Amino acid sequence: MENRSQFGTRAGFIMAAVGSAIGLGNIWRFPAVAYENGGGAFFIPYLFALLTAGIPLLILEFTIGHKYRGSAPLSYFRMNRKLEWLGWWQVAIAFVISTYYSVIIAWAMSYSVFSFNLGWGDDTEGFLFGKYLNLSAEAGQTGSIVPGVFIPLVIVWAVALGILFRGVKKGIEVANKIFIPALVIIFLIIVIRAVTLPGAMEGLDAFFKPDFSKIADPSVWVAAYGQIFFSLSIAFAIMITYSSYLPKKSDITNNAFITGFGNSSFELLAGIGVFAALGFMAQSQGLSVQDVVSGGVGLAFVVFPQIINSFPALNGLFGFLFFASLVLAGLTSLISITETYVAAVSEKFGISRKKAVLFGGGLSAIVSILFATQNGLRFLDVADYFINQFGVAFVGLIEVIVVVWFLRKLNPLQAHANEISDIRLGAWWKVCLGVITPVVLGFMMFGLFKINLLKQFDTENGNYEGYPDMFINLSGWAVAAFALVLGFLFTVKRWSSKTEADTTYKEVS
């Protein structure tokens, strides 16, 4: 009889998977990416990327986790004993991401409090970088811990680890059943209010107006695949880990389609809310929408506070709802990211879940303090860029090449998925994973290595954001390399006797 933890309901798994996929990037990255790559026309390559890469990869990872019944390292180990390193590489990437992702949630938590009295004032940019983050003058200087970031960071980790302490069914599932509906309701309120503001229609027109000439640009297709890839929590152990908690008779392909389209639906909702608000801001300042469009940290913590300042009424409430939505979206993702190494450490060393949460989550929480210092924003910016581009995207390419091309595991994985799923996998799935996905990811990685190694960014020194070489090497390349090296180091340690004994695994019937 299987002793592995399980989700209590199918809805619980879907909420958890969607909660992992829906994160900060849905709100602050997707709208700007869509606008810059053809507006309404971008949805053509975006949908194509979802159907030919996003959902096929979700199905692949759901099937691996469900078939081999383990964390990413254990699942790959059971697939092929020489493949354990790939799982640990993904887990190491997840660990790095959790250390700085938690800090962004802490910022959002602080700003939800600032919303009540519009504490950021009129100069929202000066407040963020000066008064709140107390950003140091030079890259590379750590500086002191910023109390306004550190205190909410402690709260974020207390909530996340407290949920993980309670386990899969009573912790992760229950939390996502509360957080995801709350997130959707809150964001619907934001969108409804935003589209009724003066200038909202101009913002939506800018967002949806198609520029079909962009479709002929290969970079637009790469942007679409990149958005899908980074948005769905693919290739850093999450979906493999979560699907290993599914009951034996679970519809894998259906769950993948629901997760993929659920995530994309929220991205579209976020785009509507963001651009309606940007349209209002543009009109109130006498500017065009193009002049106020931004993404990332600037959109969330500089532009949106400016928008909230201009609201005709209920500024504080709208601000609180917006930043509360960031907190909820961030927490559901942080929980899933942390679960990857909690599960892996527990299985590898044969320790209890609670000890794994204390060890893995506690270590991540300690490391995250680095990003709560005066130079934390710069450390975060570089680490995030390099671990995503040369961690997540690169390991995704390697995952597909190894599993599909070298080990030729698609046939047994297809048979497993088809046995328990309503939507049967056919030749389309093999073509997507065997040809389309590796070609697009390969092209994307070639471009990324080229622009970074040859220093082709439009900055004074050619580096990403113009950072000094030493800072790029230590906070960027070294972090990405650390994840890969850690992946190989963890394979040296034998699995716990309990896990080793079970590694003549029972195929899921």
Enumerate the predicted regions with their spans.
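Inter-helical loop and helix-membrane interface segments of multi-pass membrane transporters/permeases
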Residues: E2-S5, V33-N37, A72-W85, W89, ...
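Transmembrane helix-loop junctions in multi-pass membrane proteins
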Residues: L24-V33, G40, A160-G171, I192-L204, ...
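C-terminal membrane-solvent junction of multi-pass transporters and transport-like membrane proteins
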Residues: F349, R353-G361, I387-S475, Y505-S509
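Membrane-interface "cap" regions at the ends of multi-pass membrane proteins
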Residues: M1-W28, L57-F62, H66-R78, W85, ...
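Extracellular loop-to-transmembrane helix junctions
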Residues: S5, A34-L60, L86, G148, ...
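Hydrophobic alpha-helical segments and their helix-loop junctions in multi-pass secondary transporters
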Residues: L57, Y101-G126, V184-F208, L278-F280, ...
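Membrane-embedded translocation segments of transport machinery
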Residues: E2-F7, A11, E173, K177-S336, ...
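Transmembrane helix-boundary motif of multi-pass solute transporters/channels
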Residues: R10-A49, E202, I238-L246, N255-F257, ...
